Amino acid sequence: MSSISQNDLSNLDDGSKKEIMTFLESENSKQKVQMSIHQFTNLCFKNCISNVQNADLSSQEEQCLNNCVNRFLDTNIRIVKGLQSIQ
């Protein structure tokens, strides 16, 4: 895989630079979402699943996971709103 030098970037027109920046921002956003999903999956699995006995979740495990993910999302939304109100 080749790398892009600063010189290569400086040779691009403004439209291409903007397109690359938009692409990078999109990829960065995707990465943040994936990291959040991994984080709450890991946290909720540790909190809700004590013993894996088969491929299916018990009703208690399923309810615990649903509640955990919902609380995680609610908390993140509240934090984002709080940060936005500060700005």
UniProtKB/Swiss-Prot annotation:
Cystine pairs: C44-C68, C48-C64
Superkingdom: Eukaryota
One annotated Gene Ontology cellular component of this protein: mitochondrial inner membrane
Database matches in Pfam families: zf-Tim10_DDP
Membrane-topology annotation of the record: Peripheral membrane protein
Gene Ontology MF, one: metal ion binding
Principal localisation: mitochondrion
Residue interval(s) of motif Twin CX3C motif: 44-68
InterPro entries per UniProt: Tim10-like, Tim10-like_dom_sf
GO BP, sorted A to Z: protein transport
Location in or out of the cell: Mitochondrion inner membrane
Keywords carried by this UniProt record: Chaperone, Disulfide bond, Membrane, Metal-binding, Mitochondrion, Mitochondrion inner membrane, Protein transport, Translocation, Transport, Zinc
Oligomeric and partner information: Heterohexamer; composed of 3 copies of TIM8 and 3 copies of TIM13, named soluble 70 kDa complex. Associates with the TIM22 complex, whose core is composed of TIM22 and TIM54. Interacts with the transmembrane regions of multi-pass transmembrane proteins in transit.
Family listed: Belongs to the small Tim family.
This protein's domain notes: The twin CX3C motif contains 4 conserved Cys residues that form 2 disulfide bonds in the mitochondrial intermembrane space. However, during the transit of TIM8 from cytoplasm into mitochondrion, the Cys residues probably coordinate zinc, thereby preventing folding and allowing its transfer across mitochondrial outer membrane.
Function: Mitochondrial intermembrane chaperone that participates in the import and insertion of some multi-pass transmembrane proteins into the mitochondrial inner membrane. Also required for the transfer of beta-barrel precursors from the TOM complex to the sorting and assembly machinery (SAM complex) of the outer membrane. Acts as a chaperone-like protein that protects the hydrophobic precursors from aggregation and guide them through the mitochondrial intermembrane space.
Protein name (Swiss-Prot/TrEMBL): Mitochondrial import inner membrane translocase subunit TIM8
Gene from which this protein is expressed: TIM8
